[in-house]
Swiss-Prot record:
This is Phospholipid-transporting ATPase DNF1. Changing N550 to K/S: Does not alter phosphatidic acid or sphingomyelin uptake. Changing E586A: Decreases phosphatidylcholine, phosphatidylserine and phosphatidylethanolamine uptake. PROSITE patterns: ATPASE_E1_E2. Changing Y574A: Decreases phosphatidylcholine, phosphatidylserine and phosphatidylethanolamine uptake.
Amino acid sequence: MSGTFHGDGHAPMSPFEDTFQFEDNSSNEDTHIAPTHFDDGATSNKYSRPQVSFNDETPKNKREDAEEFTFNDDTEYDNHSFQPTPKLNNGSGTFDDVELDNDSGEPHTNYDGMKRFRMGTKRNKKGNPIMGRSKTLKWARKNIPNPFEDFTKDDIDPGAINRAQELRTVYYNMPLPKDMIDEEGNPIMQYPRNKIRTTKYTPLTFLPKNILFQFHNFANVYFLVLIILGAFQIFGVTNPGLSAVPLVVIVIITAIKDAIEDSRRTVLDLEVNNTKTHILEGVENENVSTDNISLWRRFKKANSRLLFKFIQYCKEHLTEEGKKKRMQRKRHELRVQKTVGTSGPRSSLDSIDSYRVSADYGRPSLDYDNLEQGAGEANIVDRSLPPRTDCKFAKNYWKGVKVGDIVRIHNNDEIPADIILLSTSDTDGACYVETKNLDGETNLKVRQSLKCTNTIRTSKDIARTKFWIESEGPHSNLYTYQGNMKWRNLADGEIRNEPITINNVLLRGCTLRNTKWAMGVVMFTGGDTKIMLNSGITPTKKSRISRELNFSVVINFVLLFILCFVSGIANGVYYDKKGRSRFSYEFGTIAGSAATNGFVSFWVAVILYQSLVPISLYISVEIIKTAQAAFIYGDVLLYNAKLDYPCTPKSWNISDDLGQVEYIFSDKTGTLTQNVMEFKKCTINGVSYGRAYTEALAGLRKRQGIDVETEGRREKAEIAKDRDTMIDELRALSGNSQFYPEEVTFVSKEFVRDLKGASGEVQQRCCEHFMLALALCHSVLVEANPDNPKKLDLKAQSPDEAALVATARDVGFSFVGKTKKGLIIEMQGIQKEFEILNILEFNSSRKRMSCIVKIPGLNPGDEPRALLICKGADSIIYSRLSRQSGSNSEAILEKTALHLEQYATEGLRTLCIAQRELSWSEYEKWNEKYDIAAASLANREDELEVVADSIERELILLGGTAIEDRLQDGVPDCIELLAEAGIKLWVLTGDKVETAINIGFSCNLLNNEMELLVIKTTGDDVKEFGSEPSEIVDALLSKYLKEYFNLTGSEEEIFEAKKDHEFPKGNYAIVIDGDALKLALYGEDIRRKFLLLCKNCRAVLCCRVSPSQKAAVVKLVKDSLDVMTLAIGDGSNDVAMIQSADVGIGIAGEEGRQAVMCSDYAIGQFRYLARLVLVHGRWSYKRLAEMIPEFFYKNMIFALALFWYGIYNDFDGSYLYEYTYMMFYNLAFTSLPVIFLGILDQDVNDTISLVVPQLYRVGILRKEWNQRKFLWYMLDGLYQSIICFFFPYLVYHKNMIVTSNGLGLDHRYFVGVYVTTIAVISCNTYVLLHQYRWDWFSGLFIALSCLVVFAWTGIWSSAIASREFFKAAARIYGAPSFWAVFFVAVLFCLLPRFTYDSFQKFFYPTDVEIVREMWQHGHFDHYPPGYDPTDPNRPKVTKAGQHGEKIIEGIALSDNLGGSNYSRDSVVTEEIPMTFMHGEDGSPSGYQKQETWMTSPKETQDLLQSPQFQQAQTFGRGPSTNVRSSLDRTREQMIATNQLDNRYSVERARTSLDLPGVTNAASLIGTQQNN
């Protein structure tokens, strides 16, 4: 191929035109590219590290303590030893000269009186540690970022910045400078051991610490005080030891549970600390001192190793998983022996199954022992020295790894510490790591060794090397690291420097993959490693009921105090009453006076009425919540078979919160969508390629009144036909070894034909150049497929990037591997190597990525060129396009902008690709600045961004891409269900506005009847409200509130909004971008207006938002409106939002598992959220809301009966009940019914819960649990306590309690049997009456609980040890009066409540009672068991079923739950007014899918010429009207020639959405021209 093409309005010039050929007779010589030659003669300034200084905000004490030294450009050197003279901080932000030792030339500082400490990472001038190990671990606690700070640094943890200033220097094979050692020659700096301990206890501290921890619980302290009081005889406790049994049992059970949990952590700690790695021996590590191991530590070490070996043996021989691993290991060893042989190298190095194809692709291995140092090699290994035979790598434990050690990690081994990578088995110094344990991401990541040490291969090489590393301090940020490798060049004696970034670091917790070995120097150990600094615990959450339960407990404490106070006063008054037997028989009693006796009686009453605050309540609640979590985990309908992932509860104590959720905050990418990117369309040189029928497009056409099912079938059939044609032509085009037809997503037979030259040579070369740019500008890795080694799988950190590279591969531009210098691309069957000079990585603030490729000169003597390829957001790229004449064709820019607008309207994610060609001198000047910025330790990221920004300008547009992120299965149905349940959904996404809007339409979040209220800081609103962004946002909020809702944003309106939990009546939706949201969250007044506006809208879309903004929005709603919030996401950028919400849901998706690890519940797909919330959440809330008041009610009966008894014995503290009754009332007699009520009760089954989601609203309105209900149950308990006591008392008072032999039953314990039996049967029957689910299982447990009281009375009273209670059962149960009183009292206890419930259910049925009646009449029989409306494979209901659905929708479910005015007869009537599904104004109450209008050709033309359309196209453009007219002419021409679909333009004109950040053709052109 010959010839050139220039920027003449057709296409940009290709700098690759002379570097590759596509004719069949191409030779390998044409593919050669000259390698890069590194300049050995570079001056020290190029590699020197800039001077470290402090800013004005640095605390004084931090400046004084910064004693690390750095080498500057003006470093002085000793003439004999070439040792640098460091400069130490003098406290003023500068550095003073430091005296060198005359003998060694090492820098030193005098530290008089310095003391050595074992732990700590830094010392002050007195020798005391500034940061100890315990304090180091505290840095793991991370807070949610401030939403009002600069969001360009959202990924930086403030704690990480502070600790990063604690600089450290590590020397290898060199003596330490004198300022770094003390008088004894030991290093001053002390680093944490690599041994970690995550356990709470040790064998010696378990008992005291665990007991102390348990008694942080106020309830335990309360009951301990009661036991202590009971130990004193004066308080009249019959058996003090027996009274302690319940608390002792609870403490023991809890201690056993804690011991089991901690033992698991102990086992894990032992496994980690005793994991083996390979550490270099023979070279003394000067950075750490030798430990003096005490005899006690030796004893502990021996025991821990024995314990570890025992645990390992048990795991391998007793567990199925261990047996399987043992067999796999044996098979692997056998395979290695067969492969390697007895004389081969050891298996740890050469028995690794490596499928990777990267740096060593197609090249023979090299013998590095005989390798001579080349001219371009960094002169760091002194090969003139004789090899040391004493240096070797030996196995050691992780806990023995120290800072400064050289370690070697083998394939599939975990990294033992944070390590600077020196070399790898890869000839190019690359290795692959899996960071799943660190950040949850499953994609492999590449790490590169330092260039200066890449040739190190053996222990002999590393022993002949000397260097030191200057590093920042430890911090928790996983994605940044700054350091410098320094060494003295052997050739000229000058100090050389190579910057170290996070790409040169292996972090602890990661696993080495597909690399035989990697070698590095340990920089951080133990608590200083990033994984330990990030090991903060997910914030502890308590459910709303648990929080409100505390108030109920306080009420009971108040009641307890009143009862005790009355008892004490009454007993004191009765004490002085004349004529009492006390004066004759109790002279000189312990109390001694009325006041003292009243005081003692108060505490006696506290012991007596203690069951008012039941200790068993907390245990029962924990049992119930644990069982609920187990049921959620075991639900097979929440199991994702594709991921092999069930719904996993991480927080077991908030299941009831799932039943009260009012607001759901959702991410879009990977949550609503699959995050599986498919390349669908592209625009190259003004020509659009690709066919796709996306879900967003289907939603758009559905709103236009088109039959999308028919059209979808037709479109998909035509696409499939074109796909087959395209695949056949691609096969005939070239010999693409990486072509796999089943993976093709880009369908365009026109593109393949243009690739052959059908539209001319210019368009052909444009297509080739565009795809080559996609194949070069990326950070993707390739890995051989285990099942098919010839097939290369793409491993990318971003699914978008993988889609771009995969499409380039599909059309013949295959990325097949990396080398040390660049990339290997197979172009139409011919492999070429492209040298990559620099990669400017993507981040959230840049929104772009670039690479610089070296292009050889046309002739052997010509100067090479450099080509910058840049890809990024369309608005970013257009703002950086060159405006020079002849650089970018205006027509192509307009066509590309219109294509991108069309793609975005179809719901596709758009990117632009551009380039810039540089002369070699321009590149070298820029690269010098880049090297200086890269070597900076302070603000390296900021400096690199400034340098990158300077070159990513004056770009030439190549084209644009469009990628589809498909909706997850069942998302539209799930959102519709949640809306019908009354739950409001807010979408918080970092994606573009138009993409979010189209996804909103396609997933039923938005409908065509909604009016979108846009909040932005640009566009026409600037003229109306002013130029200040904050003024614009404030004015827009005030305008919308007043115009649409007649609100002002006052505090009174917020107070009223807290009471209103109804679904918004209006048909409005909010759209706001990140810039406007940042201002809306700043300031109390504007924040209040924003919140009120959003509350009154049906849907809220926050686009282009940062992670901290997501968290801020959630906290704003949760704290200001006092509502239950749920956040759901799948990526690391959703963690802050998930942890801020009351309930956090993580989706196990494509972006890793970090969101899952930080969540409260983890699910496999978004659609499972409906079942989790509407079924399990509603059940859990309803069960717990009924169980808790029942618990207080039954204790109220039992305790108040004692109070009524006190009236007749002067409140002297006598026990009415035999003491074992006091113990077993809550433990055995009445506990099981309420516990099983909280675990198993169901008002309706799971299918009905999903088919009738309106039942969920009772949780939003908090009708099931409130203080009113609690007080009502307490009053019921008060009434029944009166019946339980006074019915037996009246019989006793009339002397009616006699046995068949005439003996009386006048003992108080006998009366207590009457009271206890009546109370137990009444309570258990009361629970049965309030239980919806009556089956044999629940009936069995209630019957057993009722029988236990009779059984225990008979067993215990038959024992002589019962003393006064002896033979009580025989005498009482043999008396007819007992059975008469028993039945009458139970009847009177339950009759009022039974009457009230029956009246209410018949005349004022609640919604659930109406639905239950329908259920009994068979209206839901047509639904199969486990029917899920969100399941895309659900069975279709029959006509009878549809008829049933119509009846269900017609139920008059009232907004006032529990107060419906419809009788039971209305349930079976078909003529029912639909008041629930629609508001009072007739508007839909949920996200209803609407059918709208169709457009005729005439209407289309009228709309295009209407002022409304013109207004819709003016957003974001400059003042020039020529731009608009030129773009409109281009648009009309493209529509006329079928290059642009007019339906999209009509839709945009119809809706007239003036949206922020929308990919709008006019705004893009305006951005480029205003640049």
